[in-house]
């Protein structure tokens, strides 16, 4: 779970994660937050023995944080790996549902755009930008996924092992699209489960125009440059997951 200036959310989100999955292990990756998020995370370790904290020097970005987290998970031999935000836009109450869906899938996406998914706090312009971005990405890259830019995911270890982590130099939406793209092109089974995605109530959003521009440019470059090789396999539909 990457963090940057999330001191107001951290204690509550950590407590909610452990309430949802008591036997989990949690890694907080803090990019030198000036508000003391990293130090607060260190202090929580006494209460949560399976909580670990990675301190990075400076704001190095979401994509590199997840790559570091993936490497950590591989080193520690974790079979299942989640990624999520620390601001409660990704509600920990959905963690058991994502984990259950991983019984029939390799990558599970907490999706805003399958039936049952919602973005209740978004205005028209944000819905338009996000909706267009997802249609654009899945059309250009031919991805059978409704929510290509989702950042709430559950991976089986084999998916992360198949990623070329050394080659990933992306942030934000582009990073999220790339993980879906690589998983699909390498033949892994992908499912989407619906989530309600509220806006953060505390703290400041990290979204920027640069992140959106990076994602648009990445999609074009990925399409023009080919992609990861591997046999395609049709993903399990969200309807199959909902009925399981």
Show which residues each predicted segment covers:
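Acceptor/aglycone-binding surface of glycosyltransferases and processive sugar-polymer synthases
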Residues: 54-75, 80, 92-173, 200-215, ...
């Amino acid at each position: 779970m990457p963090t940057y200036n999330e001191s107001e959310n951290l204690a509550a989100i950590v407590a909610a994660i452990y309430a949802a999955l008591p036997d989990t292990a949690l890694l907080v990756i803090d990019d030198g937050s000036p508000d003391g998020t990293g130090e607060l995370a260190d202090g929580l370790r006494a209460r949560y023995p399976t909580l670990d904290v990675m301190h990075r020097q400076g704001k190095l970005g979401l994509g590199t944080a997840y790559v570091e987290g993936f490497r950590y998970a591989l080193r520690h031999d974790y079979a299942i790996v989640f990624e999520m935000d620390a601001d409660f836009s990704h509600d920990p109450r959905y963690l058991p549902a994502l984990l259950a869906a991983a019984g029939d899938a390799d990558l599970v996406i907490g999706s805003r755009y399958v039936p049952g998914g919602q973005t209740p706090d978004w205005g028209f312009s944000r819905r338009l930008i996000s909706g267009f971005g997802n249609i654009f990405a899945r059309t250009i890259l031919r991805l059978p996924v409704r929510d290509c830019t989702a950042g709430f995911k559950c991976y089986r270890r084999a998916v992360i092992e198949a990623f070329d982590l050394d080659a990933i130099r992306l942030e934000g939406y582009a990073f999220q699209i790339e993980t879906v793209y690589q998983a699909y092109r390498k033949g892994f089974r992908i499912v989407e489960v619906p989530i309600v995605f509220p806006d953060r109530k505390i703290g400041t959003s990290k979204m920027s125009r640069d992140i959106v521009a990076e994602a648009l440019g990445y999609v074009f470059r990925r399409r023009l440059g080919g992609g990861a090789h591997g046999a395609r396999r049709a993903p399990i539909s969200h309807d199959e997951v909902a009925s399981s």
